[in-house]
């Protein structure tokens, strides 16, 4: 091949000797040139056509090499003309020629003439290269230019500029050689943010990149760097807050020139989240940290160090480190964060200590030094035994800096808890010294002189063998010697002995023959807080070991109340999670269960129900799964244990947070049975109600009408297999539409009330006719026998006023588990009986019998009976009768009302502050004993039956507390049925005080007002009553101003029915300002300080958000008006809203409005429509400026030139940034049905792109279907605008954005619909967008009028499984 090529080309370029001797003196005529060219080309064509396809590239490369081997510019020029003609006549492919020329090793800038001629040829033929080829050539040319040094002779610059001209041609928008989006991507790869382009390119490249700033802006959320989340402990992963773990930058899509602040590390965001209590899971989600992969994260380390420095600064200004003060809470939280992140090796301890030293050096901050050493002691004492001494020695460097005293530091008052902080440095030295001795290290550190008195005090205390609990000496010794077993045994032994009891003394517990070890006073919280994590771990380990040991030996003596309460208190510490709650759920519970230690199992479940706080959702769902397994075991078929298991399960189900439900239940999709009850219809109904509430509050089903393809489907189907049931229409109407549809499709035939009555009569006849006692007992307690026995007992009491001994024996034989079905049937039977009762005397008799069955005979507990009644699915009149029975049971006899009022009066919900809970608990149970084994009936029968069943220990529970989760359900059922509103008010008046003991009263109120928003419209009095009853129940246990605002309490609580209070703008401003100040960490904050470990909410912002939403939903103002008033806080000029802080206010509005029901936030859509229809966007003459400046909120705001369109844009971004994907999924419909017919101008179109563009990334990650619909809508709008405009001024930014959308998000998923639309665009637009369709000859696919009618584009049939990033 090479020989043939050589002969062809050498023939053309050969010259006579005389020509070479006198170059430039001889010239070929143009005709001769042309003849040569034609003959050369003819010979080459013949050769080329004979070549195989595979050899083409090699051939072209040889030609290029041959040309570059020539030294005469004339020859090179001639040969290049040959190549150009070969390309122009279609003989050679232009891409192959260009690539071979530019990739040639011999093309060097030093050969300036070859360089100039080569790029001139490329410029001539590059127009024929396909767009992907042009992209590749651009990349190579840019790299080639980089080889030119910074200084070259000015003589050669002109020649070198030929390369710049090629680049200029490629970047020329009107030439459209490739999508400009490809070009900017290649340029930004070589010249990222902050790197200057090569001098040869001058401003050509930077000007081109600048044309993409509008596209970058379209894809940016306004004020994104100022938006902050509210941290909750739901475990829900939110993509909005993800950051790059190496740089802390936002993960921006595409290599666009975004605004500078978006490229900055988002330290403020991470720092804010780190400052929030219970934020560690969110930090891990944000940075993609996985506990399994121990990866160090230096940026996280830096922020933790900065937080410690901030705490040191705060301590410097605080007068005293008081109990529960801001500074104390901050140090407590810091200690927890530090341990977690260092323990999982996301942060390195020695690096952090050295960094702290560096940042504190020369600052003179020493007031907080003891607290800092306390934080460091936590980690050191717990990990020094497993790590090298050298890792901890930097602490001594910090000591030298912070403890400059030459004299001895005096011993603090050890009666105060903060004395443990003052001793922290001495404790650290003791641990370091102990480690050095154990390692036989030469690094022995003598005790610093300033710590001598502290050290001597500890040594002396250790010699004192009888330690008292009245000061903090025990805590000090535990902290100092936790790594020295000889010395540690004494103080730890003293603690343990206090709570275990001495093994001889006994105290009674509620119920018959139930005794416990006689230690009733738990360790106080401030003592536990004064122990290091290491000491706390030893204590909790000791307790768990003891419990397991007692479970194995099946001890007849119950655990000491002090031990149980102390164990509960220790479980609140997140720092000891592995031995704490994790050990409790994963080891202790299963071990106790295997040992059949039912008393201890009952105790653990009671603890979980009444003493646990902020337990992570996966632990709670794991426990629920354990409980369903437990319920199926024969040994738990015992009245008290069965009741406890069901009550605990009910609490777990109803207490699931709305944002927790989906992440937790999707973990069980392969086996939904594990989290569902195989036999309890009530528990499964409770789960469905929780599911309905959660999907409503999170707007999960918004925009969809079926559960097909969702995580709910298998759960619902499994429930219907286990416990088939129906729902009353008034309950069903409150469900989200897809759930309503599911239950309508899966309707279960109900047994008629008439049949039930007939069956009861039939069984009663049998009962009366049978005489053999054994036969009766066998017959009526048999498995599979109709569950009508309670109905028979009712008949007996109605007719004979008494129940025989056989009745008692049957009840006993039926067993706790089977009896639930009897209660269920009895509930239906009662409704029938009361419905058909003649009233008057007969009705009173019915009421009396029913109350006797609960209170006199103890046949069924009140909470179970009411739960069953509340969960039945009666309609109309029968539903009202059912609720009437509930009201009678709760209020008619004094039994329950007295129990409630006495319990509420005598007790406080703040168990962590009490030392005498056990005494109060026992006196209450003495006055109102729990009777769970039909005791009343056993005493009444003739002859009386002695009770055999010993009680399992009860430490915390009673009928009032057991009733609380049932009361939650009762209130909801009453809300659904309009005619029983008055009865609900009566219940709240008499029993509302119980909410004082609800563990999540505000959340319950929030969920209720949110879920029943439609039910409660125009029922302002009832809303107010509900809020007043629940919030008012806590008035004695909460400081003033903890929840509702003073303005609300003054005006709304006292408003008259006929004259509701309508708040002014200033009210809304103050309410939003309260959340703004809370999130900014203002001190003192708008809300009183509290110990977040025992609070309903994990941190101040979560509390502020929920109480604000409750107050707004409780107003006697329609949701739409409240929503508009919230938007007006920033959209209208408000004197109370500071300009310099406007994005923080928008952030707060976004958080609040998205946490409210749909009518509140949907008003934003109306605002957007009014802006889009405003003259500034519809008339081209109204605004002569640059639209991208008009939409740039930050620039407009800073220059005081803001317009309503930029404000609305920024506010919409803040709202949508905080929205759930369910709320966002209404955007496609909003675009196609509302905005598409309105958008006619370029400004309107750009405004819509600005609005929705930044959220494509979330749609791609969370709901691809919506992304595809939005993609099509964007093209439909473009077609509208194109047809309504004579010329588009901003065609390039529009096209750039559409290319960005294709390559970053939609890929080819919208190709089919989009091709039809592009075919109908005007030529200039069609030319620019031609690479999206890949149609070379674009003919209109449909007549233009068919697509200009504003109808939505056809939907994509399927979502692509993988979206190409580049193509």
Swiss-Prot record:
Subcellular location, principal: nucleus
Keyword Lyase assigned: no
One of the GO biological process terms: positive regulation of gene expression
Keywords carried by this UniProt record: Activator, Nucleus, Transcription, Transcription regulation
A cellular-component GO term for this protein: ubiquitin ligase complex
Subcellular location: Nucleus
Disordered: region residues: 1343-1367
Pfam family, one: Med23
Compositional bias (Polar residues): 1346-1367
Protein's UniProt keywords contain Magnesium: no
InterPro entries in alphabetical order: Mediator_Med23
Function: Component of the Mediator complex, a coactivator involved in the regulated transcription of nearly all RNA polymerase II-dependent genes. Mediator functions as a bridge to convey information from gene-specific regulatory proteins to the basal RNA polymerase II transcription machinery. Mediator is recruited to promoters by direct interactions with regulatory proteins and serves as a scaffold for the assembly of a functional pre-initiation complex with RNA polymerase II and the general transcription factors.
Quaternary state and interactors: Component of the Mediator complex, which is composed of MED1, MED4, MED6, MED7, MED8, MED9, MED10, MED11, MED12, MED13, MED13L, MED14, MED15, MED16, MED17, MED18, MED19, MED20, MED21, MED22, MED23, MED24, MED25, MED26, MED27, MED29, MED30, MED31, CCNC, CDK8 and CDC2L6/CDK11. The MED12, MED13, CCNC and CDK8 subunits form a distinct module termed the CDK8 module. Mediator containing the CDK8 module is less active than Mediator lacking this module in supporting transcriptional activation.
Family as reported in the entry's similarity comment: Belongs to the Mediator complex subunit 23 family.
Name recorded for this polypeptide: Mediator of RNA polymerase II transcription subunit 23
Gene: Med23
